[in-house]
């Protein structure tokens, strides 16, 4: 009976912790695979969990139009521009109004400027990093173009 209670408690704790699997469409594999920590820092910054952190360089995803996880054809399109963009410029409306702190209920897919797609395919790299209470699972995918 104690074993069952332990397993149920462990399962509840595991399900309570939010897990985000990230892969940004159009991300160049050499950029994301070469500097996993920096990419995770970018993700945490975009989530608003490190609102005062300064990034040493631009985050490795380009500024493009609206993105959606439902657009599978978009995975194979060429990048139209090579400009890099700081994620703070992509803040959701709550952050644009001056409130830098994002609420947990704010969905990542409610972005008006662009959406980030989430996929699990990777280049044999799976890292987990703690972003405050959120575990970031970063999957790095190698693109063949």
UniProtKB/Swiss-Prot annotation:
Keywords: Cleavage on pair of basic residues, Developmental protein, Differentiation, Disulfide bond, Glycoprotein, Hormone, Secreted, Sexual differentiation, Signal, Spermatogenesis. Its main location: secreted. Glycans are attached at residue 132. Residues 68-112 form a propeptide. GO terms for molecular function: hormone activity. Residues 1-21 form the signal peptide. It holds the Pfam family AGH. The keyword Secreted applies. It is found in: Secreted. Androgenic gland. One of its GO terms (biological process) is sex differentiation. One of its GO terms (cellular component) is extracellular region. Disulfide bonds join 33-122, 42-59, 44-140, 123-131. The keyword Acyltransferase does not apply. Controls sex differentiation and the formation of male appendages, spermatogenesis, pigmentation, and male specific behavior. This is Androgenic gland hormone. It comes from Porcellio scaber (Common rough woodlouse). The gene is AGH.
